[in-house]
Amino acid sequence: MLFPTEFDVIVVGGGHAGTEAALASARMGAKTLLLTHNIETLGQMSCNPSIGGIGKGHLVKEVDALGGAMAAATDESGIQFRILNSSKGPAVRATRAQADRILYKAAIRHRLENQPNLWLFQQAVDDLMVEGDRVVGAVTQIGIRFRARAVVLTAGTFLDGKIHVGLNNYTGGRAGDPAAVSLSSRLKELKLPQGRLKTGTPPRIDGRTIDFSKLDEQPGDLDPIPVFSFLGRAEQHPQQLPCWVTHTNERTHDIIRGGLDRSPMYTGVIEGVGPRYCPSIEDKIHRFASKESHQIFLEPEGLTTHEFYPNGISTSLPFDVQLELVHSMRGLENAHILRPGYAIEYDYFDPRALKASLETKAINGLFFAGQINGTTGYEEAAAQGLLAGLNAGRYVQEKDAWCPRRDQAYLGVLVDDLVTRGVAEPYRMFTSRAEYRLSLREDNADMRLTEIGRELGLVDDARWDAFSRKRDAVSRETERLKSTWVTPKTLPAEEATALLGKAIEHEYSLAELLRRPGVSYDGVCGLKGGECGPAEPLADDPVLLEQIKEQVEIGIKYQGYIERQASEIERNDANENTRLPDGIDYREVRGLSFEVSQKLNEFRPETIGQASRISGVTPAAISLLMVHLKRRGLGRRNGKAAEAAEQGGGAVPTQQ
């Protein structure tokens, strides 16, 4: 048969994880096949029409810094952009965008269809081909056998998915799509540890039946208009739209309480655990019983539809209760529901059975990414997908896998949390999960990762050129500010007072002035009639110019804190990079408790750093383990990790 059936990498699933995985693998040069049950749903936003948020926006920026598609697609489809926590420090500022669902899908599909080395094929996958302890391909619904050396599984909520509305339920991967029942059964045969989780979505509302005169308007940021990609431009954005705000009330809460006897969550029909940080409205009313009202955001689904997404009332209550609770809210008294809300239960697999590369420990060449690993959210899925696709490509090229460290990226925090701690509920990223968040800001994601991405083969020439110009300009301008001095004689007292609140008493560098509270980069450069500014423009591109100025200002203002954090990272570096031998039996480590040795043997951490973050493994146990490794001559620093760290990359290859 002339039809191609042999590939380097097969990606199963075309959601946010699958599309980033396929693009990353293909950018690596691997001949890649993306299998999806429906090409029309590639990049589909199954739940809310938004990208980013606290912690999540950081992941999107990191995906972008590594050449991924999500940020660029959002710039082309975003109909409202905001910077959250804009009044707080740079570590917790985050970009969030409302997206037009149709435009977003189109942007993703365009990239997939125009990516060299990538083939698309519409077929559901029913089986994996496994020989011994390695995967060798996938079998589709109509029996086509595709062979590959690596398979990336990104099944989302489709694995044995069950949709619940009230006490009615039926199989489905999401509304309107079939569940992957056969594939779920096959994975269970492979004896991988699994469980059930649950998520949900609210009813959708026809905007023509909403009384906006009763609602509070929430516009996006307009000065300046944010962009998501480091290469993005505000001119790429389509028409911008506001969101609207309403609230639940006591009547709403009474309606919900009255329907709990028919709620699948509160009658034991749903067994899976739902997301703590995106709870259903039933859960909110139950958990926060004393709260009189909850804020509900009405978010437009796009420019060519009247559909609105009521963010905050995810529910699996019966449809008649959904209708009544919607009508109880201000502005929605006559609202027409276009689609009912529902909950969905699905299989996930314990991520502690994965390496940090997202390859399964039990089956060589099989990678998992997205909700199959117990996470929730488009952004978490996209980040995992990129990493899994990258490492699948490196696997077939017989190269060491790569995963960023916790001090290097939110992606590193995400993966480390998953593979060392597992999940008891759907995992969502927050800035609070990162202990080094001052160094892991949105604004410096490219500074942290683009150089590594270039070495890995993920970053194209256009991105590399823009990054190189930015990096060099930031370095030059930072040095200029540190080496340019003003004195009481050269800086007029009235100018100093206007900027600093008082005249200067002795010589200061411009960097020292910039460190003062309330002083901006532009303010310092404007001293002496602009003579303190750079002799030549830092960049011709206004977007790049703003990025450079932001980097320079943050780097100087927070220099002391950043250096302190860097010292802490350096102290912990030995543990993070000390690898544990594959075959070590922790029962032989003298002094370890039975509980600790049992956990270490069960979860098989790859490094001392990972072992230290397993629940129940104490600092004393880590000390005993270090002594054991030293005594036996087993512990080793990864040479490539050390080499990459010296070059500024800090990449930590993980064993295949």
From Swiss-Prot:
It comes from Burkholderia orbicola (strain MC0-3). NCBIfam families: mnmG_gidA (TIGR00136). The lineage of its organism: Bacteria, Pseudomonadati, Pseudomonadota, Betaproteobacteria, Burkholderiales. Residues 636-656 are annotated as: Disordered. NAD(+) binds at residues 274-288. It comes from the Bacteria. GO terms for biological process: tRNA methylation; tRNA wobble uridine modification. SUPFAM superfamilies: FAD/NAD(P)-binding domain (SSF51905). Its cofactor is FAD. It holds the Pfam family GIDA. InterPro entries: FAD/NAD-bd_sf (IPR036188), GIDA_C_N (IPR049312), MnmG (IPR004416), MnmG-rel (IPR002218), MnmG-rel_CS (IPR020595), MnmG_C (IPR026904), MnmG_C_subdom (IPR047001), MnmG_C_subdom_sf (IPR044920). GO terms for molecular function: flavin adenine dinucleotide binding. FAD binds at G13, G14, G15, H16, A17, G18. GO terms for cellular component: cytosol. Residues 647-656 have a biased composition (Gly residues). Keywords: Cytoplasm, FAD, Flavoprotein, NAD, tRNA processing. NAD-binding protein involved in the addition of a carboxymethylaminomethyl (cmnm) group at the wobble position (U34) of certain tRNAs, forming tRNA-cmnm(5)s(2)U34. Homodimer. Heterotetramer of two MnmE and two MnmG subunits. It is found in: Cytoplasm. This is tRNA uridine 5-carboxymethylaminomethyl modification enzyme MnmG. The keyword Cytoplasm applies. Its main location: cytoplasm. Belongs to the MnmG family.
